[in-house]
Amino acid sequence: QNWPHPPMPPAP
């Protein structure tokens, strides 16, 4: 089950 999540910082 997926829900809208806040944007995450770019992975290193």
Curated annotation (Swiss-Prot):
Modified residues (Pyrrolidone carboxylic acid): 1
Name of the protein in its database record: Bradykinin-potentiating peptide 12d
Family of the protein in this entry: Belongs to the bradykinin-potentiating peptide family.
Keywords: Hypotensive agent, Metalloenzyme inhibitor, Metalloprotease inhibitor, Protease inhibitor, Pyrrolidone carboxylic acid, Secreted, Toxin
Main function: This peptide both inhibits the activity of the angiotensin-converting enzyme (ACE) and enhances the action of bradykinin by inhibiting the peptidases that inactivate it. It acts as an indirect hypotensive agent.
Domain of life: Eukaryota
Expression across tissues: Expressed by the venom gland.
GO molecular function: peptidase inhibitor activity; toxin activity
Subcellular localization(s) per the UniProt record: Secreted
Origin species: Bothrops cotiara
GO cellular component: extracellular region
GO annotation terms (biological process): regulation of blood pressure
